[in-house]
UniProtKB/Swiss-Prot annotation:
Protein name in the entry: Light-independent protochlorophyllide reductase subunit B
EC number: 1.3.7.7
Signal peptide range: none
Upper taxonomic lineage: Bacteria, Bacillati, Cyanobacteriota, Cyanophyceae, Synechococcales
Gene3D superfamilies from the UniProt entry: 1.20.89.20, Nitrogenase molybdenum iron protein domain (3.40.50.1980), Proto-chlorophyllide reductase 57 kD subunit B (1.10.8.550)
Pathway, per record: Porphyrin-containing compound metabolism; chlorophyll biosynthesis (light-independent)
Record text on subunit structure and interactions: Protochlorophyllide reductase is composed of three subunits; ChlL, ChlN and ChlB. Forms a heterotetramer of two ChlB and two ChlN subunits.
Gene: chlB
Keyword presence, Cell membrane: no
């Protein structure tokens, strides 16, 4: 266990809450102490929902541990069933309750309830939120469909041709607290409808128990979010013979590949290769003269597996960026992320330590960071522009407007979101030319982040660099001014090299001449 002020994922029972809150007619009884009852804020504040999550807490206290906590579980299960009348009941325990080994799921299953009871065993000390969401959705699908499992798991995705109807697919994986899931579903539905493909079931987002039972009626499954749906799609493929698509349609190239994959599986004529150029503005923008300032921009990418992989492809193939860092906190997605990083000549960063991510970001010296809410904070400290591409996210990353990431419109949104933090070419030149004029205020809000400043500096001042003993270094005002003329994305590296050079030669005061000497030294 690690003590930290930030975590990329919550414990697995938060993933279970996401599934329960995403569905209709499902209630979750969570065996948990008072301190674990914080879920309401996640959904009402961050997700901007008007409804509280369908969760009942047993809220045991320290004095209850000397008595019969099993009876406490049963009482809360009865009360939840009587009050909410759910179509299906999820029963599990929080990370703290796991320690007392009450097995609430088994207790609930032995109560003779009329609705399906799904017992969740989510190891809180070895797994995390996305795994918990995937396991919960998998257990829901498995428990509700096990009686429909055919003896022969042969499934023909071209059955629609013989039945004289349009092909039908399911969209699996979208959930609450996912990144733009609501908007992605609408965009993918629109995309498929334009190609003559109907959408049968969307799950877990907005689905009920009866909807899950209709999953086998479709011709194939679309795995929109592998972190949540891949295990369920694999089970449906093994037991029902239902194939599923593996391409996540984020970006122009991936959207085209997704359509080709789905059309091939359904036995349909694939779409035209130039459809992306006709329906999305991203290809035209990225090839226009105005976007030449994007070419070669250094980008650091970190997020969940699906969005990090999609961002790496868009940056390298569609926008002409240079990817200088790629990583994920999703250990379940480590293998494909490592493969993508290797193809880009990089070593993937697989970590859930935000400090390690910040250190890697500083070392890579990018011009743009694509990451989570935490990377936005880290990038601001480093003075680097940032766009959020993945959960965990802030409420400001859940816009009221339609803002998908998938499909043709998603590609347009991505172009805007990623380019807006960057300074345009002319703006960059003007700021470089006039930065030292007295009218220019460093503290002005800009796309580079809120680094602040104090306008004109006192040229007689010295800047102290904390160090041990007699090794303290001092930057003079003219040295700092010269350093500011260096592009921000390599400024940190130049500062470190100059300080290392100054220590090597025994120089305690760093001025512009020291900076030039260090530059010559490292170029030699």
């Amino acid at each position: 266990m690690q003590l930290t002020l930030w975590t990329y994922e919550g414990p697995p029972h938060v993933g279970a809450m996401r599934i329960a809150a995403s569905m209709r007619g499902v209630h979750y009884v969570l065996h948990a102490p008072q301190g674990d009852t914080y879920a309401d804020l996640l959904f009402t504040m961050i997700e901007r929902r008007g409804q509280r999550p369908p969760v009942t807490y047993t809220t045991f206290q320290a004095r209850d541990l000397g008595g019969d906590t099993a009876e406490l579980v049963k009482r809360h299960v009865r009360e939840a069933v009587d009050r909410f009348q759910p179509d299906a009941l999820l029963v599990g325990e929080s990370c703290t309750a796991e320690l007392i080994q009450d097995q609430p799921g088994a207790l609930a299953q032995g109560m003779g309830l009329t609705m399906p009871v799904v017992s969740l065993e989510l190891p809180a000390y070895s797994k995390k939120e996305n795994w918990g969401a995937a396991e919960t959705f998998y257990q829901m699908v498995r428990n509700l469909l096990k009686e429909q499992t055919p003896a022969n798991n042969q499934h023909d995705p071209m059955t629609w041709q013989h039945q004289g109807r349009r092909p039908r697919v399911n969209l699996l994986g979208p959930s609450l607290l996912g990144f733009r899931c609501r908007d992605d579903v609408l965009e993918v539905q629109k995309l498929l409808t334009l190609h003559g493909i109907d959408v049968g079931v969307v799950a877990p987002l907005g689905a009920g128990v009866e909807d899950l039972k209709r999953i086998p009626d479709a011709d194939l499954n679309v795995c929109l979010y592998p972190e949540v749906a891949e295990s369920s799609c694999s089970w449906l493929e093994r037991n029902f013979g239902m194939p599923f698509s593996r391409t996540v349609p984020i970006g122009v190239g991936a959207t085209h590949d997704f359509l080709v994959e789905v059309h091939d599986m359904l036995g349909m004529e694939p779409p035209a290769p130039d459809e992306g150029y006709r329906r999305s503005r991203l290809p035209w923008y990225s090839e226009s003269v105005d976007s030449t300032y994007l070419t070669g921009k250094r980008v650091f990418i970190f997020g969940d597996g699906s969005h990090a992989l999609a961002a790496a492809r868009i940056c390298s193939e569609e926008l002409g960026f240079t990817v200088v860092g790629l990583g994920t906190y999703s250990r379940e997605m480590a293998r494909p992320v490592r493969a993508a990083a290797k193809a880009l000549g990089l070593e993937a960063l697989i970590s859930d330590d935000y400090l390690a991510v910040e250190a890697a970001m500083a070392k890579a010296a990018p011009e743009l960071v694509l990451g989570t809410q935490m990377e936005r904070h880290s990038a601001k400290r480093l003075g680097i522009p940032c766009a959020v591409i993945s959960t965990p996210m802030h409420v400001q990353d859940v816009p009221a407007r339609m803002s998908p990431q998938m499909g043709w419109e998603g590609a347009n949104v991505i172009f805007d979101d990623w380019v807006h933090p960057l300074m345009m070419g002319l703006e960059e030149h003007l700021i470089g030319m006039f930065r030292h004029d007295f009218e220019f205020v460093d503290g002005h809000q800009s796309h580079l982040g809120h680094t602040g400043g104090a306008g004109a500096a006192d040229h007689s001042a010295l800047t102290d660099i904390p160090a041990d003993g007699d090794d303290a270094l001092h930057w003079t005002a003219d040295g700092e001014a010269e350093l500011k003329k260096i592009p921000f994305f390599v400024r940190g590296k130049v500062r470190r090299n100059t300080e290392a050079y100054a220590r090597d030669v025994g120089c305690r005061v760093i001025n512009s001449e020291t900076l030039y000497d260090a530059k010559a030294h490292f170029k030699a």
